[in-house]
């Protein structure tokens, strides 16, 4: 069966793959991976009701778990039923408020709904648990920029450049964004030398930071 699944995977035949994963579920009803693979196949086919049936079967045979909860939410999201998707994650979050995966999914759904204040509240919770989470840092930075909350924006800006989790490329992108706008240069002028010095210490072989610092001074 595995050989056939590999063959169908190469041809993107999700229908046949789903059938085989369901056959494997009948052989081993306690194997979580079989359910998840079948669910993804049906999601790729746009067969969301079938995907939900597999989730229900997994919850019955294995019990509810984090992966299944997030997958269930994703099925509704892919089916453009965002409110139902959000409801599932909110219920899970209430039972386990410090679960990072639920928080990440919750922030993603709030962004989809353009509810940026709620999304930022979730990012703040993520950063309380995982202070160097790059997604939360970068997203919070963008939200504070759009809301013109300068103190919070500067605070997150400095955290980004002190973080080893935010990549060099992401930091360069932020600097390019700032240096392409005179208003932003003015806004960050007291902090630019500090963050550039930090970048040079962290990435001594990256010429870009030396050039930008030289031009700025």
Provide a role label for each language-model segment.
Residues 1-217:
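Alpha-solenoid helical repeat scaffolds
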């Amino acid at each position: 069966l595995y050989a056939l699944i590999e063959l169908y995977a190469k041809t993107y035949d999700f229908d046949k793959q789903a059938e085989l994963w369901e056959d494997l579920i009948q052989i081993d009803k306690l194997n979580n991976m079989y359910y998840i693979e079948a669910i993804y196949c049906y999601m790729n086919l746009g067969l969301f009701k079938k995907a939900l049936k597999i989730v229900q079967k997994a919850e019955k045979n294995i019990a509810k778990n984090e992966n299944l909860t997030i997958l269930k939410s994703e099925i509704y999201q892919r089916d453009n039923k965002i409110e139902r998707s959000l409801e599932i994650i909110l219920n899970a979050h209430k039972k386990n408020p410090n679960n990072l995966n639920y928080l990440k999914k919750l922030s993603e759904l709030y962004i989809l709904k353009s509810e940026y204040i709620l999304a930022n509240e979730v990012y703040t919770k993520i950063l309380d648990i995982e202070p160097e989470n790059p997604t939360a840092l970068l997203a919070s930075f963008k939200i504070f920029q759009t809301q013109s909350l300068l103190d919070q924006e500067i605070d997150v800006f400095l955290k980004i450049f002190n973080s080893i989790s935010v990549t060099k490329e992401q930091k360069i992108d932020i600097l390019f964004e700032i240096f392409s706008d005179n208003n932003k240069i003015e806004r960050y002028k007291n902090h630019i030398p500090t963050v550039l010095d930090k970048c040079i210490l962290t990435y001594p072989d990256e010429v870009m930071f030396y050039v930008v610092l030289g031009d700025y001074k």
